[in-house]
Amino acid sequence: MLTLRTLVLALLFLAQAQTYPPPYPRPGTTKVMENDLVIVWDVSWLKQAYPTHRHVYDYAGIYYTDGDRIIVSEQGARSPTHSVAWDTFVLPKGITHSEEGASEQPLRGIFLEFKQPKPVGTIDTRTSPAAFPGASAKQLKDSERVTIWELAPGQLPSPHLHTRDAVVVAFTGLKPRVTFVGRGTVHGDEQTTGADRVFTFEVK
């Protein structure tokens, strides 16, 4: 009986200790940029099954096309999921699942992984010039890791101050362009001339 109990405990330990790969890189996904704070990915859910993976970072993002996928839990439960263009999200690390693309035209999104385990918490406290984003931006999400803004192109204060590090994602004809703006930057615009939609992720 002791031997059986030991075997059961060993199997439980192995199950708990099981490791999974990170979600990216994988087919359909391109790394757009990386620095000490973030990794930015352009993600497409191709019509195929992807291996089980674990999100090792807190992450956030925005979908820029509609699309379908099937999310499969560690226990094997299958959840058909439809995502809509311009929906945003903020999610914690530790999520473990697999995914299958289910659309003829794949779901696409820009994902930011936050490399620091906790918010950095540092802001630029200067009061001049006017701080980003001014009065014309719409706040979409606010969490302990990030604030997501949708900007009206061309309507930011000029010049303006970025009190936090930020990732600017501009879309022109569903083609994303990603720019990192460091904390303390003072400039006149986000270099998004001609963009159809502009979103900024202020990293905390």
Question: Model-derived features: where do they sit?
Answer:
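Hydrophobic h-region of N-terminal signal peptides that target proteins for export
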Residues: 9-17
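Sec-dependent signal peptide recognition
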Residues: 1-9
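Jelly-roll (double-stranded beta-helix
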Residues: 17-204
